[in-house]
Amino acid sequence: MLKNETLRRDADAIIRASLNAVLPDEAVRRALKNFRPQGGRVLLVAAGKAAWQMAHAAVKFLGRVDGGVVVTKYGHVKGTIPGVDCCEAGHPVPDENGFAATRKALELVQGLTAEDTVLFLLSGGGSALFEKPLIPGAELQQITGQLLASGADIVEMNTIRKRLSGVKGGRFAQSCAPAQVFSIVLSDILGDPLDMIASGPAVPDTSTCAQALAIAEKYHLQLSAQAKALLAQETPKVLDRVATQITGSVRELCSAAANACRELGYEPVILTDRLCCEAREAGSFLGSIARTHAGQGNKLAFLAGGETVVHLTGTGLGGRNQELALAAAPVIAGLDAAVFSVGSDGTDGPTDAAGGYVDGSTAAALVQNQLKVYDVLQNNDAYHALKAVDGLIITGATGTNVNDVSVVLIGNQG
């Protein structure tokens, strides 16, 4: 079966339209309509993969700020912002540059008065990028690596990370007191739990130390005595003079993707905006939907937003969206159908790809390249397999981060 160029073009168009709809510029401007400074200084702190774009939009809207710090992922700073120190740091594992940038932010908010305002711009990735470790940095990096490899979901990971940090779980807002803190948040966690997005630096924490200890036991985390003691301590449950507004989420991403499908002649159905399971299981399931509905003579689209997980069993290269797509390839073999999945931030795992695309021809192409899907997935090497069959989705850094969207396209040929 020849590669389906029509489905690939449609997939690319849907990706562009959905990502454009959740870019932070307009979202930040919309949220700032509710921004009411107290009359004193206005200081800006932005953390996360979308931090630079959010800060750039905010300063453009406000005209100026009295100082600021941005900390974002390597390669995500796009230029200078007047009055703002723009820093890059490690993600998903925190590094010394992130620690240094966070120290700058904490120094910036020291000695504020009740007349001052901290504009805090937060997006996904902030848990790694915005960090003041309460344990040695090397140990925090090691614990983060354990969590990433364990298959723990983002809520479980952040419940642990809050207690090992001097800024997470509401502690950054405490550092800003008595100033007002106005937070604008791009949500990357299903259901938009404010205290879990980037580990909630400026909102009260709803998780408990009992939950943290249970998670550590569940995943058999190797912890020092100091780290164990911190997990047993509670985080701030009440904060004063803090306001928070969510301005982007996976629901908007799914809605935009569905609208793009409709404009291309597909009948779209949003299955869920809370997809949360093993990536390869999600891929097989979405592939089975294509197998069930193909051949009916209608152009159909099924969409799922959320964030899957990957249990590392090998030493290859890839990401959750690439694994999802690859797992669908054998299920849709021979069909006039495609499955693709993309991360809204433009990066999927430690790769330059945003996600992966497969269609009815991909399984045969993999065989021609002497690649077996099961073996590739066991080695977590979806990147190289998809690259061999032109199945990588490359967008570059988008400047936003509101989870992932996965799409099944079914052509009218069956």
Give the ranges of each region predicted by the language model.
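Glycine-rich oxoanion-binding loops at beta->alpha junctions
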Residues: 72-115, 156, 160-161
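A glycine- and small-aliphatic-rich helix-loop capping segment at beta-alpha/alpha-beta transitions
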Residues: 57-67, 81-86, 106, 110, ...
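Accessory alpha-helical/coil subdomains and C-terminal extensions
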Residues: 161, 179-182, 204-285, 289
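Short beta-strand segments
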Residues: 45-47, 69-72, 119-124, 183-189, ...
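Internal gly/pro-rich beta-alpha loop/helix module
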Residues: 136-222
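An N-terminal, well-structured beta->alpha segment
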Residues: 1-45, 53-54
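Internal helix-turn-beta structural module
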Residues: 326-414
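Active-site segments that bind and position negatively charged phosphate/pyrophosphate groups
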Residues: 265-341, 350
